[in-house]
Amino acid sequence: MDIFLVVLVLLTIIAISNIVNRFVPFIPVPLIQVALGIIAASFPQGLHFELNTELFFVLFIAPLLFNDGKRTPRAELWNLRAPILLLALGLVFATVIVGGYTIHWMIPSIPLAAAFGLAAILSPTDVVAVSALSGRVKMPKGILRLLEGEGLMNDASGLVAFKFAIAAAVTGAFSLAQAAFSFVLISAGGLLSGVVISFLIIRFRLFLRRLGMQDVTMHMLIQILTPFVIYLAAEEIGVSGILAVVAGGITHAVEQDRLESTMVKLQIVSSSTWNIILFILNGLVFVILGAQIPDVVSVIFNDTAFNNMMVIGYIIVITLTLMILRFLWVLFFWNGKWFFNKDQSIYKPGLRSTLLISVSGVRGAVTLAGSFSIPYVLSDGSPFPERNLILFLAAGVIMCTLVLATIVLPILTDKPEDNVKEKKVKLLTARRKLIKAALTAIKENMNETNKTASFAVIAEYNEKMKNLRFQQFTVKNRTKKDERKVRAQGIQAEQEELLRLIERGDIPEETADSLQERFDELEVLYTNPFKVGLSKKKLKRLMYWIFFGEQKKPEMTILNEEGLIRATRVKTAKAAIESLKKHMTEENKDVTLAVISFYNHLIFRLGHSYHEQNPSRRFENQKLEIKLRAVQAIRNEIQTLFEEREISRDMSHELRQYINDVEAAMLDGDE
């Protein structure tokens, strides 16, 4: 029961972290998850559990790296093989040597072998954290692929170096020749075992298909089990399980098209299932990381043998050492003409890109999990020297690199003046995708009962799709902000005209309330970019219709009410046109004329639609329900585009405002 409660709390924290990210999108989700994990573990009765290193690697790291190996473009990795090896192998060993001597010089109480071990476990970068952070900023494609390739390889090299350093610290014996031979054997064996085991699994799946066993559920289960089987088998024979799952992922990617091209349903189910699994695993990694930090920190802060400010200073010095070494390594080795030829296909970063690569070296879960595997005692039975301090330093460096990357990466990558045209193209493409998502949602929920209303809404969205390109040119001389301001002025003029009609007694109270409610919704949508423009009254009416059915009224009463509302709206629209003409200046002329054109179109539509159709309240409620589903589909699509890095954070905000514009237009047409 305790394990179940811990898992339930962890999953709840993941859900909360994504909700929080919607309100503070400038903070990456991993950092929020780490913070929530820290908070959950800070209370005496909070989230406390011992991190099992072996279980952590097989349960989390194996499937995550398998998926990364499967999804990372192989051709781009091959083109970047030299710089990837430079970072994943060369920089790791340089970090072990330079970092080890620096740590031992700064903290003599940590033996040199243990210092090498700490430097080794600090050398791997966290590919999960890098992917999450890069989703918030626009990184050059070459740098992103380089960081992904580095993250796939350096976990293994760092852990192998860590293993030998800790073994030397425990036993007091070390052989460089033996360590080098073992490293080659473990690495090559891991890659080879991953390829062989993956090939056998693929052949097994083909064999099942030849037997006619093409059940999607069974094949999906084999896919899910694959990374665990590869990792455990590789570790059992004494080679690198991490490199094995990476090689296994790449092997599966090579065979994927041939194996699954005829199983379209499996591809769809596989994509959806893995997205859910990866979402949960990524979140759990960072929440668990945060949950371990309070216990690690409290041990050092409560120990009178340590000066708290001094140990924090150690963390800062180690972090800066890692960053500077990474910067110099990339700068000198990349710009060395003796190393790279002038092949333009090889990405060669400048100073800015070098800084990006340096700051993107975020440490994460592998570092903390590896440090927890340090034994408590040496071979002679004495306590491992400064084990608690080593854990504290590892946790501190993880937090420093994560926070530093969060702050610095947007500064280094945000160059809006260089991407204006690209942004316009992306926004136009994204808007088309949003409308397509809405149309898909409408068609999926269409049935015999709501078919007429569905076709009506589909027609509206098709019209929007056709007008997108026209809108791109008509709004080029005005900003959306100015347009919303003028539209808000028009709504205000309509409200004033409505008050005059009420004072003269030209319209009944129920009609006035209905129109005032609509004007309030439109005003909110044009002035508040983050508020949903659905009133409580309308929502209540919709829910009543969904659960209890429509409120019966005589057909003639309904027609009279609809006709009166339309006639009144024509009057308020004409009043808005007159008001906008009076306030039109040279500065806002283009915007004002566009809004006046909108009102003229509205008047024309209101005057004709009443004679062409006799809408019932049921029909209108059906349309409202369909539109709400479509709007939600659009919001989901925006989040998907953001998570898949097709749009930036700023573009997602702009598109969410675009949703409000669409919703306002729908409410205007919902007469």
Swiss-Prot record:
User: Cross-referenced Pfam families, in alphabetical order?
Assistant: Na_H_Exchanger
| The keyword Transport belongs to this UniProt entry's keyword annotation | yes
Gene symbol of the encoding locus: nhaK
Keyword Nucleotidyltransferase on entry = no
> How is this protein named in the record?
Sodium, potassium, lithium and rubidium/H(+) antiporter
Q: Which domain of life is it from?
A: Bacteria
Q: Which terms under GO biological process does the entry name?
A: regulation of intracellular pH; sodium ion import across plasma membrane
Q: Main role? A: Transporter involved in the efflux of sodium, potassium, lithium and rubidium.
One of the record's GO molecular function terms = sodium:proton antiporter activity
GO cellular component terms given for this protein: plasma membrane
Name the keywords, alphabetized.
Cell membrane, Ion transport, Lithium, Membrane, Potassium, Potassium transport, Sodium, Sodium transport, Transmembrane, Transmembrane helix, Transport
Report the InterPro entries cross-referenced here: Cation/H_exchanger_CPA1 (IPR018422), Cation/H_exchanger_CPA1_bac (IPR004705), Cation/H_exchanger_TM (IPR006153), VHS_dom (IPR002014)
Q: List where the protein spans the membrane.
A: 5-27, 46-66, 83-103, 110-130, 156-176, 182-202, 228-248, 276-296, 314-334, 355-375, 389-409
Return the similarity comment.
Answer: Belongs to the monovalent cation:proton antiporter 1 (CPA1) transporter (TC 2.A.36) family. Nhak (TC 2.A.36.3.2) subfamily.
Membrane topology qualifier: Multi-pass membrane protein
Q: Where in the cell is it found?
A: Cell membrane
